[in-house]
Amino acid sequence: MANTTSAKKATRKIARRTIINKSRRTQMRGAVRSVEDAIKKGDREAALKAMANAEPQLMRAAQRNIIHKNNASRKVSRLTHQIAKLAK
């Protein structure tokens, strides 16, 4: 339990940020899932559209320290490679 005023305030700020970060993480996961679903269906156009939405969300999440930047880059890279395979 926080004793000082500043520690209590920090606890409140952390709670607010946690709610916001959970929301952003959920949106990001949904965007990635939509790309993966389009890839499973073999629909390249839908996958490209979904990827255009998912990539900025992943990079924004990395920028805001919701996920690590290498994690975001790895996900973008893997999804891009899977979409490229659909063209073949």
From Swiss-Prot:
Keywords: Ribonucleoprotein, Ribosomal protein, RNA-binding, rRNA-binding. GO terms for biological process: translation. The keyword Ribonucleoprotein applies. GO terms for molecular function: small ribosomal subunit rRNA binding; structural constituent of ribosome. The keyword rRNA-binding applies. Disulfide bonds: none annotated. One of its GO terms (cellular component) is small ribosomal subunit. Binds directly to 16S ribosomal RNA. Belongs to the bacterial ribosomal protein bS20 family. This is Small ribosomal subunit protein bS20. It comes from Bradyrhizobium sp. (strain BTAi1 / ATCC BAA-1182). The gene is rpsT.
